[in-house]
């Protein structure tokens, strides 16, 4: 279990948030409902989805490295 108030917890939360928003971008109903705004508070979801789709290789590698760290090292 990772604590959100530690650095590795924030990294895990950020990676999961980016991966989830990138998945939401692939689902048509969720894309129109959640990712329609590009500014403001709801724009964070859109920006995370753009990061997840444009940097999908780096995000995937970071998820694998973080999973290894959380499961075996921590």
From Swiss-Prot:
Residues 74 are cytoplasmic. The keyword Isomerase does not apply. Its main location: Golgi. Residues 1-22 form the signal peptide. GO terms for cellular component: Golgi membrane. InterPro entries: Kish-B, Ksh1. The chain crosses the membrane at residues 53-73. The keyword Transmembrane applies. It is found in: Golgi apparatus membrane. Pfam families: DUF1242 (PF06842). Residues 23-52 are extracellular. Keywords: Golgi apparatus, Membrane, Signal, Transmembrane, Transmembrane helix. It is a single-pass type I membrane protein. Belongs to the KISH family. Involved in the early part of the secretory pathway. This is Protein kish-B. It comes from Bos taurus. The lineage of its organism: Eukaryota, Metazoa, Chordata, Craniata, Vertebrata.
